[in-house]
Amino acid sequence: MARIAGVNIPNHQHTVIGLTAIFGIGTTRANKICQTTGVAIDKKVKDLTDADLEKLRDEVGKFITEGDLRREVTMSIKRLMDLGCYRGVRHRKGLPVRGQRTKTNARTRKGPRKSGVQLKK
């Protein structure tokens, strides 16, 4: 297994697919990285030479990935919540942030249904 940006990339995968295992690198960025380093897209990770891996590590190192990116996203959400703006309030309440309807749907964000109002006996 090759180790790039602190992530073990499976040997049996193609280089492009393997790079997407790194948080912050999707298919478009993985294609761009392979293109700039000159590594074949359809080459398996186990077939990469040490020189190829070093090129990939250097290119991936230019981007914000993994822990730094996760921290940045978390801090961005925390900043919104501290500001008390609409988006921050929605994050705090655990509701959809981007204007989706909540009368029906939004179950992923709201969690499982609470039991309904019970009648007095």
UniProtKB/Swiss-Prot annotation:
Species name: Polynucleobacter asymbioticus (strain DSM 18221 / CIP 109841 / QLW-P1DMWA-1)
Superkingdom per UniProt: Bacteria
Keywords of the record: Ribonucleoprotein, Ribosomal protein, RNA-binding, rRNA-binding, tRNA-binding
Function: Located at the top of the head of the 30S subunit, it contacts several helices of the 16S rRNA. In the 70S ribosome it contacts the 23S rRNA (bridge B1a) and protein L5 of the 50S subunit (bridge B1b), connecting the 2 subunits; these bridges are implicated in subunit movement. Contacts the tRNAs in the A and P-sites.
Name of protein: Small ribosomal subunit protein uS13
InterPro entries on file: Rbsml_uS13_C, Ribosomal_uS13, Ribosomal_uS13-like_H2TH, Ribosomal_uS13_bac-type, Ribosomal_uS13_CS
A Pfam family this chain is assigned to: Ribosomal_S13
Similarity-based family: Belongs to the universal ribosomal protein uS13 family.
SUPFAM superfamilies from the UniProt entry: S13-like H2TH domain
Assembly and interaction partners: Part of the 30S ribosomal subunit. Forms a loose heterodimer with protein S19. Forms two bridges to the 50S subunit in the 70S ribosome.
GO CC aspect terms: cytosol; small ribosomal subunit
Region (Disordered): 92-121
Gene name linked to the record: rpsM
One of the record's GO molecular function terms: structural constituent of ribosome
Any single GO BP term: translation
